[in-house]
């Protein structure tokens, strides 16, 4: 595909995605015409509390209470949370509920069972009391952290877009870089460009718009579908890079030409399958909040194939390294050394892009440690485009050699142009001075000598310096 085709596709997809996300007039008009939508939050919270209360009373009735020994505080529902039987003198605790936006689920709620086997009574109200004060103790800090993470993501995708566009410009401009491996690089970069654009639109137009998320219109679900599809394309194009190198080095033994159609089907076509299955499943289960909620195992439909692709890719790359090391020991071929450099970049990149899935299940429960974890995960997730462009383009030896060669040519041309213009000015000044002298003294023979061959030789000697780098 030419650069103009890539540009047109990028413009159309970005415009369509932004239109899908932003063009939801039915939501805004319904909010203006129906004031009860303002209380949508209250309705959702009430439903959560009623559901939790129903489950608590079922649990209270089913649990066996015959094996109690000593004074025990009875199981109870305090209005928000369910508490099991607790021994006297013990402080029971559990995580804060997610009923309200300013509640931090990582913080803990406590309820004291006194030595007498009664739940603690608040001295002012003389009623049983549960300590929820820590749930919104760090609300301001949490909001500040959320905004920092939001801007960190935007900056990351902005830097990624800048570096990716520069890299694509280099690949398209310098025809000497054109080969099948660079074509795969272009598709990989283009998938990361689309991912950054759609993520920026998603963060600013959907995730940052709570009213839109609660209304759950079809437009934001479509944008989430596109987002997850492009997200999968990133990793399957990385798999294409690994398969290409494996076929080139291990299977086809340095054969340069391969059929790229299969790579296009794998990189752009296959991610449609898990994205479609996920969309159908979410439409039947967890069909809420624009499909943003992550408390569902349905996300394994997306993450499972991605993890499988990365494991297969890692296996291919390790096998390639094994083959290349063997070839280098036996033959010491320069070509094997060059391929080793190409493999090294991919081998470094695959773990860096996949480490987030290793860390994903291990989010710490503490507030500070969870905040550090969020910062690390945001850097790993939202700066991937910058990382890919840096390793595959800016650190690429071929790209550096081409840029260095063109820079030296530019310096030579620019330097020779300056030297030539200075020489022409000097020759013109010399010729005009001689002409003036000839006019004053009327020495015709000398004039003919200067305007003849000897003069042109002098001119050429001035224009063509011995040192071409001067």
Curated annotation (Swiss-Prot):
Glycans are attached at residues 28, 74, 126, 131, 295. Its main location: membrane. Residues 1-23 form the signal peptide. Gene3D superfamilies: GPCR, family 2, extracellular hormone receptor domain, Rhodopsin 7-helix transmembrane proteins. It is found in: Cell membrane. InterPro entries: GPCR_2, GPCR_2-like_7TM, GPCR_2_calcitonin_rcpt_fam, GPCR_2_CGRP1_rcpt, GPCR_2_extracell_dom_sf, GPCR_2_extracellular_dom, GPCR_2_secretin-like, GPCR_2_secretin-like_CS. It comes from the Eukaryota. It is a multi-pass membrane protein. SUPFAM superfamilies: Family A G protein-coupled receptor-like, Hormone receptor domain. The chain crosses the membrane at residues 148-172, 184-206, 218-246, 261-281, 298-322, 338-359, 375-395. One of its GO terms (biological process) is artery morphogenesis. One of its GO terms (molecular function) is adrenomedullin receptor activity. Residues 24-147, 207-217, 282-297, 360-374 are extracellular. Disulfide bonds join 56-82, 73-113, 96-135. One of its GO terms (cellular component) is plasma membrane. Keywords: Cell membrane, Disulfide bond, G-protein coupled receptor, Glycoprotein, Membrane, Receptor, Signal, Transducer, Transmembrane, Transmembrane helix. PANTHER family: CALCITONIN GENE-RELATED PEPTIDE TYPE 1 RECEPTOR, PDF RECEPTOR-LIKE PROTEIN-RELATED. Belongs to the G-protein coupled receptor 2 family. May function as G protein-coupled receptor for calcitonin-gene-related peptides and adrenomedullin. Specificity may be modulated by accessory proteins. May activate cAMP-dependent pathway. This is Calcitonin gene-related peptide type 1 receptor. It comes from Danio rerio. The lineage of its organism: Eukaryota, Metazoa, Chordata, Craniata, Vertebrata.
């Amino acid at each position: 595909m030419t650069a103009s085709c890539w540009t047109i596709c990028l413009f159309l997809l970005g415009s369509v995605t932004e239109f899908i996300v932003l063009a939801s007039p039915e939501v805004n008009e319904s909010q203006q015409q129906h004031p009860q939508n303002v209380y949508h939050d209250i309705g959702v919270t009430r439903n959560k509390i009623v559901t939790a209360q129903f489950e608590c009373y079922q649990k209270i009735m089913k649990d066996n209470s015959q094996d109690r020994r000593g004074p025990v505080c009875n199981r109870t529902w305090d209005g928000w949370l369910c508490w099991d039987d607790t021994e006297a003198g013990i402080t029971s605790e559990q995580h804060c509920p997610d009923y309200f936006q300013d509640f931090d689920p990582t913080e803990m709620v406590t309820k004291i069972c006194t030595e007498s086997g009664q739940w603690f009574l608040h001295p002012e109200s003389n009623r049983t009391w549960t300590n929820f004060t820590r749930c919104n103790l760090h609300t301001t800090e949490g909001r500040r952290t959320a905004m920092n993470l939001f801007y960190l993501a935007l900056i990351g995708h902005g830097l990624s877009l800048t570096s990716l566009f520069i890299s694509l410009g280099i690949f398209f401009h310098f025809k000497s870089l054109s080969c099948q491996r660079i074509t795969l690089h272009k598709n990989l970069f283009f998938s990361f460009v689309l991912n950054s654009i759609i993520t920026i639109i998603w963060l600013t137009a959907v995730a940052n718009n709570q009213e839109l998320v609660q209304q759950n219109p079809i437009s934001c679900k479509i944008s989430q579908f596109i987002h997850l599809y492009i997200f999968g394309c990133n990793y399957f194009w990385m798999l294409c890079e690994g398969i290409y190198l494996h076929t080139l080095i291990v299977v086809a033994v340095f054969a340069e030409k391969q059929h790229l159609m299969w790579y296009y089907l794998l990189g752009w076509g296959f991610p449609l399958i898990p994205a479609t299955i996920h969309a159908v499943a979410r439409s039947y289960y967890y069909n809420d909040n624009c499909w943003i909620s992550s408390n569902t195992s349905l996300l394994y439909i997306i993450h499972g194939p991605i993890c499988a692709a990365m494991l297969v890719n890692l296996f291919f790359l390790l096998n390639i390294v094994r083959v290349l090391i063997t070839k280098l020991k036996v033959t010491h071929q320069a070509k094997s050394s060059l391929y080793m450099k190409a493999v090294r970049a991919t081998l470094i990149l695959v773990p860096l892009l996949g480490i987030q899935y290793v860390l994903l299940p291990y989010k710490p429960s503490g507030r500070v440690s969870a905040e550090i974890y969020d910062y690390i995960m945001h850097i790993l997730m939202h700066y991937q485009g910058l990382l890919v462009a840096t390793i595959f383009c800016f650190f690429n030896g071929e790209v550096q050699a081409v840029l260095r060669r063109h820079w030296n040519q530019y310096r030579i041309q620019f330097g020779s142009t300056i030297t030539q213009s200075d020489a022409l000015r000097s020759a013109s000044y010399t010729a005009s001075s001689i002409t003036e002298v000839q006019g004053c003294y009327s020495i015709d023979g000398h004039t003919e000598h200067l305007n003849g061959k000897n003069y042109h030789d002098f001119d050429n000697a001035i224009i063509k310096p011995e040192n071409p780098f001067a």
